[in-house]
Amino acid sequence: MSPKPPSDSATEMVQVVLPNDANPLGFILGGSVMHLVDIAGAIAAHRHTRSLVVTAAVDELQFLHPIKVGDLIILKARVTCTFQTSLETQVDVYSEETLTGEKKLTSRAFLTFVAVTEDGQRLRVPPLLVETEEERQVQAAARVRREERLKRRATPRA
């Protein structure tokens, strides 16, 4: 399987925040953002694997700033690291004020997807071809998140 660069899976989604996705204060619902984050991450994972993917984990999702009705919500996703049958994606969410064009980072999430066949069997994923120092740092951070996630899974809960 040939390695693929992160640029092969880079994904950008844009849509207008409408009232049906907002709370009474006129800001997009956190659940609506989470739904879009999952879709953007899955598209990036699918582009990298060229297979079906399922969401296995959301390691981190931060809401830094609200997005108001009428603004654009922009989601940028990319694969950060690959493992045997899974991969991590990073999804950055931005708001864009439609009249001024001002953009602001509003959320960031890290999701793990597993590549599967139509009958749910795991598939090996192509390695990620990291070419820049920034990509190496992002990949190293993803490996740390994975180790932490696996430790949490192995710890019995009360």
Stretch-by-stretch model annotation:
Residues V14, V33, A57-E60:
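Residue-level recognition of specific faces of alpha-helices
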Residues P3, S7, T11-E12, K68-V69, ...:
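HotDog/MaoC-like acyl-thioester-processing domains
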Residues A22-H35:
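A conserved, well-ordered hydrophobic junction motif at loop->secondary-structure transitions
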Residues P6-D8, I28, I39-K76, T80-C81, ...:
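Hydrophobic beta-strand-centered segment that forms part of the acyl-chain substrate-binding groove
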Residues Q15-D21:
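A short small-residue
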